[in-house]
């Protein structure tokens, strides 16, 4: 009897770790890497391919205030979730700000969701500096290079060239938005999702703007107002946009257990439904 219990526990553990061991992973340095970059800081992509691909690919831009990357929550866990839905996941390591924090820096004013006009052109960057703005520019180059590389490998990775888009978290959302605004045809995403990540620069919506999905929480200072402003910029330009503002005030926006106690935990399933509605997946 004890042996049977032990084998059952062992089988359960194997099942728990199976998705991690079967997930394909490849790494590629991006052409935006320079000789001056430290090895650990060079921009690159990590590729997670599903066992049963449906042709869609998502470039994951993790958050981290442009100073670190929330890799485990925003890439590794998210890639596993996307792979379960047949979607290829591409984790992006982009350039980060290595400059010391300015001395005596004050907290920015807290802007409520009801005042999106506080962010003209949806620029919700709390503090523009020369070094900070240059890093956003470099990170956007990394993101565009990632989309280009996915398209170049599309046949090999069983990806449709017209079903490649961004999902950005926090600062990674700002990177994805910046990349989208300046992309050429090979770099342009087919869809853009930002998860509590407003624009970090003035928004100029491109003529061929992809459909935009925005997810945020009503009581998130500055972020919610900045994302409402982003939605308005997209709509004023005649582009397709959808905005989800969750009001229950719970949860970070990583993958969350489906407890039924909060609406924020449904963001990932709602994103999958949105991708279906946009004909990116079946």
What are these regions (language model features)?
Residues 43-46, 105, 114, 240-282:
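C-terminal catalytic histidine-bearing segment of alpha/beta-hydrolase fold enzymes
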Residues 25-52:
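N-terminal cap/lid segment of alpha/beta-hydrolase-fold proteins
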Residues 55-64:
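Short beta-strand element of the alpha/beta-hydrolase
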Residues 68-77, 94, 225-227:
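The serine-hydrolase catalytic nucleophile loop
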Residues 72-90, 232:
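Short amphipathic alpha-helix adjacent to the substrate-entry channel of hydrolases
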Residues 190-247:
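The feature captures the conserved acid-bearing segment of alpha/beta-hydrolase catalytic domains
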Residues 137-209:
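Primarily recognizes the serine-hydrolase "nucleophile elbow" in alpha/beta-hydrolase
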Residues 106-155, 268-270:
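Alpha/beta-hydrolase active-site loop
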């Amino acid at each position: 009897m004890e042996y049977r219990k032990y084998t059952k526990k062992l089988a359960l553990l194997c099942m728990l770790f199976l998705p991690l061991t079967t997930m394909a992973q490849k790494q590629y340095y991006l052409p935006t890497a320079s000789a001056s970059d430290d090895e650990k800081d060079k921009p690159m992509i990590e590729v997670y391919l599903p066992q049963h691909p449906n042709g869609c690919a998502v470039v994951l831009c993790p958050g981290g205030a442009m100073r670190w990357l929330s890799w485990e929550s925003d890439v590794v866990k998210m890639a596993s979730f996307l792979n379960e839905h047949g979607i290829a996941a591409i984790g992006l390591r982009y350039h980060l700000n290595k400059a010391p924090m300015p001395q005596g820096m004050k907290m920015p004013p807290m802007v409520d969701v009801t005042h999106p006009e506080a962010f003209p052109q949806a620029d919700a960057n709390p503090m523009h500096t020369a070094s900070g703005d240059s890093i956003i520019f470099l990170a956007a180059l990394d993101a565009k290079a990632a989309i280009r590389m996915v398209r170049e490998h599309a046949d090999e990775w069983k990806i449709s060239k017209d079903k490649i888009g961004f999902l950005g978290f926090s600062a990674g959302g700002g990177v994805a938005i910046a990349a989208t605004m300046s992309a050429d045809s090979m770099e342009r995403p087919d869809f853009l999702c930002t998860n509590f990540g407003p624009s970090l620069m003035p928004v100029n919506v491109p003529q061929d703007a992809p459909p935009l999905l925005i997810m945020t929480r009503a009581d998130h200072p500055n972020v919610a107002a900045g994302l409402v402003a982003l939605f308005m910029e997209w709509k004023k330009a005649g582009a397709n946009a959808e905005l989800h503002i969750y009001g229950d005030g719970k949860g970070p926006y990583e993958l969350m257990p489906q407890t039924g106690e909060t609406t924020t935990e449904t963001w990932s399933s709602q994103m999958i439904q949105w991708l279906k509605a946009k004909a990116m997946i079946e």
